[in-house]
């Protein structure tokens, strides 16, 4: 009996990414990187505080790592970014330490909090106060992981590169050609395959 899948698969704990759109740390270390054979060994690795996600040490073996997260293992000097491959699965994508200093986030919503402070919420549940007033929903912002500040942003615009993060075309990369507004239902964004 295969005890690693189906009902026995590790359920990701609650965290910044949705249950359906994340990868528990234990799978990443055990099945993807082959650093451990059993769940116990993953626990031992995590408890020695080697693993960092987005620059913070995570010891929870079922911590949900999701799209665009940076996983760094100081002991081996490796950095990974979680990215979908064309089939819509998470790929192990190694990156340089320079690239591991930032991540890209999609802006989910923008609202004005108490005393008129503008807030911005990203796809991995980060809340940032006082964002640039030019940033709108669906834009992409580049976040410096050490400070959590916005360093740069890309408008949601025609002619930009994009990556599909959900649905049947998950993981496909293309150029935004045009966007149809459908008031009351979903907008349709036409993407030309790269």
From Swiss-Prot:
InterPro entries to which the protein is assigned, alphabetical: KOW, Rib_uL2_dom2, Ribosomal_eS4, Ribosomal_eS4_central_region, Ribosomal_eS4_central_sf, Ribosomal_eS4_KOW, Ribosomal_eS4_N, S4_RNA-bd
UniProt keyword annotations, A-Z: Ribonucleoprotein, Ribosomal protein, RNA-binding, rRNA-binding
Pfam families in UniProt: KOW (PF00467), Ribosomal_S4e (PF00900), RS4NT (PF08071)
Domain named S4 RNA-binding: residues: 23-85
Signal peptide limits: none
Protein name: Small ribosomal subunit protein eS4
Gene3D superfamilies registered for this protein in UniProt: 2.30.30.30, 2.40.50.740, RNA-binding S4 domain
Example of a GO biological process term: translation
UniProt key word Transmembrane: no
Gene Ontology molecular function terms on file: RNA binding; rRNA binding; structural constituent of ribosome
Annotated organism of origin: Equus caballus
Keyword rRNA-binding on entry: yes
GO cellular component: cytosolic small ribosomal subunit
Family: Belongs to the eukaryotic ribosomal protein eS4 family.
